[in-house]
Amino acid sequence: MLEVNILDKKWCSIIENPKNFVLGVINASLKELKIDHYKPNISIALADDDLLHQLNLKFREMDKPTNVLSFPYEQLSNECDLGDIAISIDTIKRESHEYYIPILAHIAHMLVHGLLHLLGYDHQKKDEEIIMKNLEREILASLGYNMCAI
């Protein structure tokens, strides 16, 4: 089951129906990755910089907000619990403006990025980063987004 929690009303001023948008991106990503039949449990928090700053400080010891954080469950159950994703509308807006990226494309990118982290992908090493970025590009292209600028 996919659960979307809107924790900041700014999301509703940018996307007419944030829950449907998020569910569409995540479901299409799972389909593109050919794992949609597993029906994983994922919770997505549509938040702001305040919450992402707190989470980033608590879990990564970084004293600043960030665009997206993923919290994979340590032990998967039979129901395929993948984990939680938190995403900040404030940072997304700032980065969209700074890098001239359409905001919906950037939101989709950060959702895909967070999902890939839940699935075990990482970008700490160069070879891992290449694999993850290629997957992001493929998924975003299937959604109609061009990731050239990112």
UniProtKB/Swiss-Prot annotation:
Query: InterPro entries of this UniProt entry?
Result: MetalPrtase_cat_dom_sf_prd, YbeY, YbeY_CS
Q: List the disulfide bonds.
A: none
Q: Which PROSITE patterns match?
A: UPF0054
Q: Which GO terms describe its molecular function?
A: metalloendopeptidase activity; RNA endonuclease activity; zinc ion binding
What is the E.C. number? 3.1.-.-
Q: Which cofactor does it need?
A: Zn(2+)
Cofactor: how and how many bound: Binds 1 zinc ion.
Q: Where does Zn(2+) bind?
A: H113, H117, H123
Swiss-Prot/TrEMBL GO biological process terms = rRNA processing
**EC primary class:** hydrolase
GO cellular component term, pick one: cytoplasm
What's its job?
Single strand-specific metallo-endoribonuclease involved in late-stage 70S ribosome quality control and in maturation of the 3' terminus of the 16S rRNA.
Question: What family does this belong to?
Answer: Belongs to the endoribonuclease YbeY family.
Quote the protein name from its UniProt record. Endoribonuclease YbeY
Q: What is the scientific name of the source organism?
A: Wolbachia sp. subsp. Drosophila simulans (strain wRi)
